[in-house]
Each structure stands twice: as structure tokens, then as C-alpha cells.
Amino acid sequence: MSRFLICSFALVLLYPAGIDMYLVGLPRIAADLNASEAQLHIAFSVYLAGMAAAMLFAGKVADRSGRKPVAIPGAALFIIASVFCSLAETSTLFLAGRFLQGLGAGCCYVVAFAILRDTLDDRRRAKVLSLLNGITCIIPVLAPVLGHLIMLKFPWQSLFWAMAMMGIAVLMLSLFILKETRPAAPAASDKPRENSESLLNRFFLSRVVITTLSVSVILTFVNTSPVLLMEIMGFERGEYATIMALTAGVSMTVSFSTPFALGIFKPRTLMITSQVLFLAAGITLAVSPSHAVSLFGITLICAGFSVGFGVAMSQALGPFSLRAGVASSTLGIAQVCGSSLWIWLAAVVGIGAWNMLIGILIACSIVSLLLIMFVAPGRPVAAHEEIHHHA
């Protein structure tokens, strides 16, 4: 079992590493490519677009051909794209490389969740996804630090060579450690069950909405945090970095505590707790009389996301024993596109950073609480329906 956990964690971590590691080198990249930093900030959106594009096909291919045939090309593409970015001499080529990086990371991301669905029952999967969420929270803190240390002695291109090395590690794991987990093609008697795993299932759709809104909350916070903390609240850059590190610490602590909480409380209780924390955060930020209270509200956001997201993702994947790849892709596409659409629309309409965050917090909590209360899960997957990996 440990081989699947290690491989899944490695496959997922390419995604945040590809986002955060290069940011520290952005000024030098812009100078060398004769582009403004503002022009290169679109590299974040281009990377997410590549991930979304990969998710359109990766899940279906993973369900038909297997997890390894998607993970291996995905890791290889991430390596090639990282090298391509390091060799880019224009901003156009650099952005093209970032898109290809997103394609590779998206393939690996989809496969990771499909593997966890294949190999873990509902309760263990919820615990592992909570742990994975905690580990993912470490990357935005550690990746820029690692990038800074690399750039003390090496040029910015070395950041992408470091990413390529990460991709090589994932490729080696996928080639030599990971075993295929896709279930065998269903027999004729299993066809009705395969057909019953519909993406239009009310319970699955409710979890798609909940996880998409939750991701929208956390990405809105990350996207608006420089404005909120430095421009509105007046913190210096060093203080901003410290606050963000502390919020990551809160996220990690809660994420690593959630598996223990699942041994005491029902998953539904933790999901309700998550949304109540979001609602409390929105109200706190709306009526906050001081910076200290506002910072407390921000910690509630991090705690709320960490306590509920892994559980919601596990519930979303639960009904899909034969179509885990497609379900994982659907979740990823909805989360990436939904959160990006909200941030874009809010910017177009002219909603300020503070109100943007408060609005999504309150909307997420109200909608999600209603869905949790009134959309019950279908029958649990029986033990004989659990998918076992190939020997």
C-alpha cells in the first residue's frame, strides 16, 4: 500500500511545485526575456489552462488504458516542458513551455486521485486526502525558499532544471515503483454497474459544487492576499511573508489533525464544520474592527478549507469504482475553471479584493451547507465492489 501512497503524493506535488517554485525568479526572467513582470504573470493562468486541457482527456484515457499509461507520459511531458522553459529566449516560448508543463502536471494530478480511489476504502481515502492536503500546503512555503536558495548561486534557468529533476523522480516512481491499479474491464454482468456510475448523479454533482466553491475560496484568498495584507492592512513585504507562512502552518496542522478527527466524528460533521468556519470567516472579515481580528478571520479560512476539502473529495470519488479517472478529471476541471471564472468575473465587475473574499466565503458556506444537509449519499460501495490492484 505504501507504494501507492508515495506515488500518488509525488504525482500530485508536481502541480503546486510548478506554480510556486519559479515565482522568486520572475523579475530576472522578465529582464532576460525583455518582458514586463505583468506580462509574465499570465504564466500562472497559462499553466492552469494546460492543466484543465489535460483533464479533458486524461481521465478517460486512464479509465480505458490504465493509470501508468497516463502518469508516465505526463511526467515525461513535465520534464520536457521544464527544460523548454529553461531554454526559452522569448516570452512567447516561455509561456508555451508553461502550458506544456500544465499539461504534464494535469495528467499526473488526475492519475493520483484515481489511484487513491482504486486502492483505498472511503474512510481511509478521506484520511489520506486530508494528509495530502496538508503536504500540499507545505509547497507554497518551501518552493519559493528553495527557489531563492537556488538563485543565490545559479541563474533563473536552474529553477526549471530543478523542476525537471522533480519530474524525473516522478517518472522513475511511475516506471519502476507504481503498479497498475485500474480494475479489469467489467464483465457483462458488471455493465449495469458501470452504466450506473453517471457523472450526473446528484450526490456527485453536489460534491463538485462544494469542492469547486472551496477551491474558489482558497484561491481568492491567495490571489488577493498581497492587496489585503500589504495595501489595505499596511504590512511590509517581510511581514506579509511571515503571515502567509503562518497561514500555511495553520493549514498543515489542521490537515494533519483531520485523519484523527475522522476516527471520532462522521465525515458529514467535518464538512459542516468546514462551512461554518467559512461563514464565520466571512462575517469576521465583514465586521472586523482591527487588523488582529481580520488575521483571525484569515486563519479561519485556512482551517475551514483544510478540515473539509479532503473529506469532500473522497465523497465525490466514492461512487466511481470503474470511472475514477473521469470523475477525477471532472472534479479538477470544475475546480480550476470555476475558481478562475469567479476571480475573473469579480475583477471585470470591479469588486474590491476585500469584498471579493467576503462574497465567496458567504456564498460558499450557504450553498455548501444546503447541499450537505439535503443531498444524501447513495448506497456505499460494498466490500466485494472495491477494486484491487493487479499483482
Curated annotation (Swiss-Prot):
Keywords, comma-separated and alphabetical: Antibiotic resistance, Cell inner membrane, Cell membrane, Membrane, Transmembrane, Transmembrane helix, Transport
Organism: Escherichia coli (strain K12)
Listed CDD domains: MFS_MdfA_MDR_like
Family: Belongs to the major facilitator superfamily. DHA1 family. MdtL (TC 2.A.1.2.22) subfamily.
Name listed for the protein in its UniProt record: Multidrug resistance protein MdtL
BP-aspect Gene Ontology terms: response to antibiotic; xenobiotic detoxification by transmembrane export across the plasma membrane
GO terms of molecular function: transmembrane transporter activity
Spans traversing the lipid bilayer: 4-24, 42-62, 69-89, 93-113, 131-151, 158-178, 203-222, 245-265, 269-289, 293-313, 331-351, 356-376
Record localization: Cell inner membrane
Phylogenetic placement of the source organism: Bacteria, Pseudomonadati, Pseudomonadota, Gammaproteobacteria, Enterobacterales
